[in-house]
Amino acid sequence: MAKNPKILSIVLAGGEGTRLMPLTRDRAKPAVPFGGVYRLIDFPLSNLVNSGYRQVVVLTQYKSHSLDRHISQVWRFSPLLGSYVSPVPAQQRLGKHWYLGSADAIYQTINIIEDVQPDIVVIVGADHVYRMDFEQMVQQHIESGAEFTVAGIRQPIEESNQFGVIEVDHDHPNMIKNFQEKPANTTGLPDNPNQILASMGNYVANTKALFEALSLDEKAADTKHDMGGDIAPYFASRNEAGVYDFNSNEIPGSTATDHAYWRDVGTIKQFYDAHMDLIAYVPEFNLYNQDWPIYTMSGNLPPAKFVHAGRDRLGHATDSIVSPGVIVSGGEVHHSVLSPNVRIHSWAQIVDSVLFDGVIINRRARVYKAILDKNVVLTENSTVGIDTEHDLARGFTVTPDGITVVPKNTIVDD
């Protein structure tokens, strides 16, 4: 391995995101807005760029127009310096079909890897919220001698059926003894039976070994063509898979509260809970860490504005994130996230909610524990999240946890 290996990063952004419906009705999951001004794709891309990796390929597939547009507008580098973030749609180079899985997505674009000729390929997912210095993971990968390294994080054992589960070789703690993808039953860690070591869906691989594994997987009869379900177990079975403990990753500017923060936001509840993490007095994930910034489009929007100061008509927001272009005009906002260009009119109430761009809440309307997609309009005195049966009757999504989701461009008129 060269002292300064050539590295290509691949972001797997082709997931359909069915569990996030209706937020993914009109967009790819990585293009879903998050945290007021960001999109989910901004988190892995920011981590790669902050790690010094600026040759990035983003593999897209379903409903990718808004994702492609966001990447082309925000993630532009100078080609003179050899830097790029390049969206690559499904090519159908080796068969007239969509990607059959994450491993097949990489195999179908293997010509791009061959053109770059990297020593190492860094592979990351596009639907998690976290900060990570991938350079630290790459250095451990090189030092360990592994052909393939998986990033691992501790998770509750009751969630083992949602993750790839890593069993570490106790004689060689940086190596994987066994890897199971989403097992129905498993055992906990030796030092904590209530936890497992879960795969984060981030991988580092030596290029030659990765090519060999992908080629074998493509020809195999019993495969789902999945990085976690097939490629990781393949390397583990050959004693060639390492594990990187995410808890050891050090980020400049991080605090004890948000150290090693990582959230899968693949369901409505996870997506909602991750937003609530942002707005605590001491947030579990600190968006304001400028030593490791999350990049996105800044836009040409004016500052947020709060107007009316009457005793019963005070425009204000507490324990909330308020984005540029927002006007709170005599309404009340509490414990919520307001995206750009939201309008809150007099005597309206927004509590425990997430409002995407361009939402308009008219007078005396009320929103509680809800996610409102772009350009939703609530007419005067209308409600969302107050009456579950009424919300369901109007065709809104209501989760078992009581989170109401209103689709894009809906006019809510009670």
Curated annotation (Swiss-Prot):
A molecular function GO annotation:
glucose-1-phosphate adenylyltransferase activity
The UniProt catalytic activity note for this protein reads:
alpha-D-glucose 1-phosphate + ATP + H(+) = ADP-alpha-D-glucose + diphosphate
Answer whether the UniProt record assigns the keyword Cell division to this protein: no
Q: Which residues bind alpha-D-glucose 1-phosphate?
A: 99, 164, 181-182, 199
- UniProt key word ATP-binding: yes
Q: In which pathway does it act?
A: Glycan biosynthesis; glycogen biosynthesis
Coiled-coil spans in chain: none
Keywords, sorted A to Z: ATP-binding, Carbohydrate metabolism, Glycogen biosynthesis, Glycogen metabolism, Nucleotide-binding, Nucleotidyltransferase, Transferase
Report any Pfam family annotated for this entry. NTP_transferase
- Matches recorded under PROSITE patterns: ADP_GLC_PYROPHOSPH_1, ADP_GLC_PYROPHOSPH_2
InterPro entries the UniProt entry points to: ADP-Glc_PPase (IPR011831), ADP_Glu_pyroP_CS (IPR005836), GlgC_bac (IPR023049), GlmU/GlgC-like_hexapep (IPR056818), NTP_transferase_dom (IPR005835), Nucleotide-diphossugar_trans (IPR029044), Trimer_LpxA-like_sf (IPR011004)
Q: Give the EC number.
A: 2.7.7.27
Tell me which NCBIfam families the record gives. glgC, PRK00725.1, PRK00844.1
Q: Subunit details for this protein?
A: Homotetramer.
This chain's function reads: Involved in the biosynthesis of ADP-glucose, a building block required for the elongation reactions to produce glycogen. Catalyzes the reaction between ATP and alpha-D-glucose 1-phosphate (G1P) to produce pyrophosphate and ADP-Glc.
Similarity field:
Belongs to the bacterial/plant glucose-1-phosphate adenylyltransferase family.
List the protein's name: Glucose-1-phosphate adenylyltransferase
Gene symbol here is glgC
